[in-house]
Amino acid sequence: IGELFSIIDNLITLHQRKSVTIKKLKSGLLRKMILTVESTLTDVFLPLFTIDWEQRKLGELAEIVSGGTPATSNPEYWDGTINWYTPAEISEARYVYGSQKKITEVGLNNSSAKILPKDRTILFTSRAGIGKTAILKNDASTNQGFQSIVVKNNIDPEFVYSMSTQIKEKAERVAAGSTFSEISGKQLGKIILMIPGIKEQQRIGELFSIIDNLITLHQRKLFIIAYIK
């Protein structure tokens, strides 16, 4: 039995190391990509990326949409079919498919919550714990703890999600100047990003999606092995 548990512990350690290594690879690629583009230097290590990028405000690339909460005292507003997210539901997963709580059409219409379109929306938490992100895979709404990024038709959501670390860092710097750590939709829309053409956006988004899938795979294996133990 002792030998069996030793094998399981070794498997856990192995997948933890793999997960950490892949996360470091992702972080390093992002930094290298941004530095290469911003310095306008060709980098043979990243042949995927050109230097033909331009500076754009996030608000030019997407609509920034806030959320709201229907009155909790009215049962007609709750337990419906409309996804309604809170920041606590956003973790490290690249995609989200369904929320813990649902609201009704009546609840939606009697609050400042709005329907956000699937596949084009990146949820972005805007209060303490700023910058947790996820791509919607089903239409949804959120509470007021978000400033969601709904990308325009010529912008790839996978690419914008891949830039979320950079967006988060800039958003935190903006929020640090306020009494309560929060970023408004107007402030978020003013954040500057470097962006390539749509085809290159798609290639970059696909690359980082593959990396995130690898991270998720090892995290799932860790969960299963720990559960078996």
Regions of interest found by a model, annotated:
Residues P47-G68:
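Non-catalytic DNA-recognition/assembly elements of restriction-modification systems
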Residues I1-E54, K199-K229:
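Amphipathic alpha-helical segments with low aromatic content
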Residues V44, R56-G59, A88, V106, ...:
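Structural detector for helix-capping/boundary residues
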Residues I1, F49, S148-I155, Q187-Q202:
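Proline-centric
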Residues P70, M163-L193:
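Specificity-determining recognition surfaces
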Residues K32, T133-L136, A176-S181:
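Short beta-strand/turn micro-motifs at beta-sheet edges
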